[in-house]
Amino acid sequence: MSTIDRLKKTLNNETGAVISSPVNRRYFTGFPSSNGFLLVTTNSTVFLTDSRYLEAAEKSITVCPVDELIDAKRQIPEFFNEHKLNRILFESDRLYISDFERMKAFFDIKEPISDGSLDKAINEMRAIKNSFELECIKKAQEIAKNAFSYILGFIKDGVTEKQTALELDFFMLKNGAEALSFDTIVVSGKNSSLPHGVPSDK
């Protein structure tokens, strides 16, 4: 069962959901993008994204149809109106109140709901990893272990924190990492007391 199908089971015939955060859009579709909306009802789903991502999304996403995002103000209400839904759930954990208020007015949805119930359902789903996610975790762990072993042999007198951080990043990306979860922290000497220190020329 796909993650979208699992989400559908948390909805009822009177309720739909808008997934707008990049991290959850990717979780449900497998497709990374900086723009888009995943619209979900109990019996229908569509991923809307703009022309920059459209071709790649159509090739990559297999769990639901993909449509071009041209006019969100029109397309999103139309989708839910077609299914005769007025109660629409929005994410709250990853949505600023000001953004929710703008979206509520912008999309003209009769009963928008941002009470945490959608986030609770998604978080409970994400807490239980599927086989693909477990493989990704194992792969990331292996990359990190190999990178640490490699960088120990790279560090020597005269090599700066910045050089070490760049070498570490390059090794991980060259050996299977898609991207960095956060900026690599490489600090030494007196900088070692900084848990979120920025690599320097030291």
Region spans (language model):
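Terminal domain-start leader segments
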Residues: 1-48, 54-55, 77, 81-85, ...
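Compact, glycine/acidic-enriched structural inserts
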Residues: 49-78
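Flexible, acidic/His-enriched mid-domain "rim/lid" segments that flank
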Residues: 71-180, 191
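Acidic, glycine-rich loop-and-beta core segments that form the ion-binding/anion-interacting portion
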Residues: 179-202
